[in-house]
UniProtKB/Swiss-Prot annotation:
Pathway: Amino-acid biosynthesis; L-methionine biosynthesis via de novo pathway; L-methionine from L-homocysteine (MetE route): step 1/1. The gene is metE. Its cofactor is Zn(2+). It catalyses: 5-methyltetrahydropteroyltri-L-glutamate + L-homocysteine = tetrahydropteroyltri-L-glutamate + L-methionine. Disulfide bonds: none annotated. GO terms for molecular function: 5-methyltetrahydropteroyltriglutamate-homocysteine S-methyltransferase activity; zinc ion binding. InterPro entries: Cbl-indep_Met_Synth_N, Cobalamin-indep_Met_synthase, Met_Synth_C/arc, UROD/MetE-like_sf. Belongs to the vitamin-B12 independent methionine synthase family. 5-methyltetrahydropteroyltri-L-glutamate binds at residues 17-20, 114, 513-514, 559, 603. It comes from Buchnera aphidicola subsp. Acyrthosiphon pisum (strain APS) (Acyrthosiphon pisum symbiotic bacterium). L-homocysteine binds at residues 429-431, 482, 597. The active site is at 692 (proton donor). HAMAP family: Meth_synth. This is 5-methyltetrahydropteroyltriglutamate--homocysteine methyltransferase. Keywords: Amino-acid biosynthesis, Metal-binding, Methionine biosynthesis, Methyltransferase, Repeat, Transferase, Zinc.
Length: 758
């Protein structure tokens, strides 16, 4: 039986980030809606054609989104929060963007969080009791029609109904969100009927929550949902990011026609798994890693798939997950070292890998895949990869270096005496707005168009401006603004040995936000200080403390494309040792507050709780290692993004940061409930306003949020700060927002003084 191939999705941003640029032009009023729609249409055509030319048999349709695919599903279901509704009973792109971004002056955006354990984000669906859901957004049908008209062999993609419900949150009056499953299923049935009328072979229906440890009522919901959806069109139940072996007993009873499994990130005995599922099911094997950039060992996969390919079952081969998480095309990289470039495979090359592998399997000819796999061996013996001096230092790391000199209670007394901050001390998270001219300066400096002297002069001028603004606003703890940094991970990668960098390796994080992850190609070490010059200069401009700003070891690891030949723990420990040296150098230069950001800490958790302990153990260890050399009077801060903290509070506390800042504003301080329950002992900056929205927070809204925070955290341990860095905001928004933040804080301080007098 012929083995066909498919991808689970393709990057949507465009090779030159065309979607990002068009979105931002539309939001700023520089682009008409018809022009934005045209950009989307052209990108879809290019993506479909590129996959077809690369040898993909089934072209995925439904992977394109104007912000994220979960929000697209909310639009399809008519699940629009009332505050975002149009004045007339209709929905449109502006409605979608309001949900994602909010609307000035005071319509808040919906919450945003991480997509499973990736650095991609989605807008969290909001579920309200008695909300009427109805089919409202026909994007999937329109795009299927587009692709069919172009002659493609189409495979529509839908986010599965159970996963959609799992990812959302009940708002307002509580009810069981599974109560609305029936209404959702009616809409899915309508969409599937429409798709069945379009002569497609099957629908890819994504249910990644099947890799989790599900409560019984959610398993029961699967039985109900897929019984209702059966018989309309063929369904390929699609899972990724981990194994579903633990759930196979109920999955195999679902009335679907096939299953996709992630063989890269899930542990499977393929022969055994194949024997457990119905013989008539298609089996789609995710063998090409959709989350990393390394060239695939096609010989390994050839042997594995051959072992079951004569079992008279229809087999598909595909990417492990959507290729959304990888850069688009390696051919666009003109400056990568030739040796290193041969080690990589981006989205287009992964399509070619699928073509090579399916051809080899069908023709029983391995010559082409042998040739493809040669660079994998070359890399294993390259001197760029393993370095004896790094290995030697690693072997001498002792566990007692993973802690501060004294416990927090002792340190806090010494720090309070040293800094004498007022109650509710104010600070920011690190970055300040980056103008077009600053981005151009960095680019020109890299290209050699600007001298180091000119570059340094302009960066220092920017630092001086940032310090002056913060002093005028009367912020207590300052930052230098990070004008020299393109990205909080890439910057450190550029100053560490063991990394490679792309010119165009962009990956979508959320909406128009794209990141360009560095690639960890070998052992990591710090050849020289990375941040000292800028922090030292900033501190020389003010008597107020200026924070040294570092990205933590887990975040550098997880927001890079990591090696696959050594453990993540080993890579993280190498990074921690480099940061340990940097922290001590900052302290020597009288930088007495040092922030080590770990926004990715929770993202790295294995998807199943039973596997959490090992990861959290080393993740905590490497953070503590990086901060372990400083004096009691040196204050260590950390920052975390979009986290559900409830089930990892033990580990958060074990980090032993003197101050943790988090993103609780967008959740209306709900995230602090876990800090209260745990009786978190250290200081907390919960985030006084949401920086991801262009709304200027009012003084009263900030006071309201801080009053809520005081219900969870003792007043003396609360810091006041924006909920994230300010790089993506403009200067006017930033100054007005910070002005209101400081004013709100001063009002509360006066109120506290008055209450003390009373």
């Amino acid at each position: 039986m012929t083995i066909l191939n498919h991808t689970l999705g393709f990057p949507r941003i465009g090779l030159n980030r065309e979607l990002k640029k068009a979105q931002e032009q539309y939001w700023s009023g520089e682009l008409m809606i018809k022009d934005l729609l045209l950009v989307g249409s052209e990108l879809r055509k290019k993506n479909w054609q590129k996959q077809k030319e690369s040898g993909i048999d089934y072209i995925p349709v439904g992977d394109f989104a104007w912000y994220d695919h979960v929000l697209t599903t909310s639009m399809m279901l008519g699940n629009i929060p009332e505050r975002h509704n149009n004045t007339v009973d209709s929905i449109d792109l502006d409605c979608l963007f309001r949900i994602a971004r909010g609307c000035p002056p005071d319509i808040s955006a919906s919450e945003m969080t991480k997509w499973f354990n990736t650095n991609y984000h989605y807008i969290v669906p909001e579920f309200y009791k008695n909300k009427v859901l109805k089919y409202s957004w026909k994007q999937i049908l329109d795009e299927v029609d587009e692709a069919l008209l172009l002659g493609h062999k189409v495979k529509p993609i839908l986010l599965g109904p159970i996963t959609y419900l799992w990812l959302g949150k009940v708002k307002g009056e509580y009810f069981d969100r599974l109560d609305i499953l029936k209404d959702i299923i009616l809409i899915y049935k309508h969409v599937l009927k429409e798709l069945s009328n379009r002569s497609i072979d099957f629908v890819q229906i994504d249910e990644p929550v099947l890799v989790l440890e599900l409560p019984k009522k959610w398993k029961d919901a699967y039985h109900y949902a897929y019984k209702e959806l059966s018989g309309i069109t063929k369904l390929l139940l699609t899972t990724y990011f981990d194994s579903i072996e633990h759930n196979i007993e109920f999955i195999r009873d679902l009335p679907v026609q096939g299953i996709h499994i992630d063989l890269v990130h899930g542990k499977y005995n393929l022969k055994n798994f194949s024997s457990k599922i119905p013989s008539e099911w298609m089996l789609s094997l995710g063998v090409i890693n959709g989350r990393n950039i390394w060239r695939s060992d096609l010989l390994k996969w050839f042997k594995s798939i051959k072992s079951i390919s004569n079992h008279h079952r229809k087999i598909l081969i595909g990417s492990s997950c959507s290729l959304l998480h990888t850069p688009i095309d390696l051919v666009a990289e003109k400056h990568l070292d030739k040796e290193v470039k041969r080690w990589f495979s981006f989205a287009v090359q992964k399509c070619e890998e699928l073509r090579l592998l399916s051809s080899a399997l069908n023709d029983n000819d391995i010559d082409s895949i042998k040739e493809w796999s040669l660079p994998i061996y070359e890399r294993s013996v390259s001197k760029r990869v393993n370095k004896i001096e790094v290995e030697n230092r690693l072997s001498n790391v002792l566990i007692d270096k993973h802690q501060r000199l004294s416990p927090y209670k002792t340190r806090s007394i010494e720090q309070n005496k040293k800094f004498n901050f007022p109650i509710l001390p104010t600070t920011t998270i690190g970055s300040f707005p980056q103008t077009i001219s600053i981005r151009k300066l960095r680019r020109d400096f890299k290209l050699g168009l600007v001298t180091e002297e000119e570059y340094t002069k302009i960066i220092k001028k920017n630092i001086k401006k940032v310090i002056k603004i913060q002093e005028e606003l009367d912020i207590d703890v300052l930052v230098h603004g990070e004008a020299e940094r393109n990205d909080m991970v890439e910057y450190f990668g550029e100053h560490l040995d063991g990394f490679a960098f792309t010119d165009n390796g962009w990956v979508q994080s959320y909406g128009s936000r794209c990141v360009k992850p560095p690639i960890i190609i070998g052992d990591i070490s710090r050849p020289k200080p990375m941040t000292i010059e800028w922090s030292k200069y900033a501190q020389s401009l003010t008597k107020k403390p200026v924070k040294g700003m570092l990205t933590g070891p887990v975040t550098i690891l997880l927001w890079s494309f990591p090696r696959e030949d050594v453990s993540l723990k080993k890579i993280a420990t190498q990074i921690a040792l480099a940061l340990y040296d940097e922290v001590l150098d900052l302290e020597k230069e009288k930088i007495e507050i040092i922030q080590i950001d770990e926004p990715a800490l929770r993202e790295g958790l294995p998807l199943r709780k039973s596997s959490w302990h090992e990861y959290l153990s080393w993740a905590v260890d490497v953070f503590r290692l990086s901060a372990s050399g400083v004096k009691n009077t040196t204050q260590i801060h950390t920052h975390m993004c979009y986290c559900e903290f409830n089930d990892i509070m033990d580990s958060i506390a074990l980090l032993d940061a003197d101050v943790i800042t988090i993103e609780a504003a967008r959740s209306d301080m709900e995230l602090l409930e876990s800090f209260k329950k745990f009786k978190y002992p250290n200081e907390v900056g919960p985030g006084a306003y949401d920086i991801h929205s262009s709304n200027i927070p009012s003084v009263q809204s900030i006071i309201s949020l801080l009053n809520k925070a005081m219900k969870y955290i003792p007043l003396k341990r609360i810091w006041v700060n924006p909920d994230c860095g300010l790089k993506t905001r403009n200067w006017n928004e930033t100054i007005l927002s910070l002005k209101n933040m400081v004013e709100a804080t001063k009002i509360l301080r006066e109120k506290m003084k008055d209450s003390e007098c009373d």
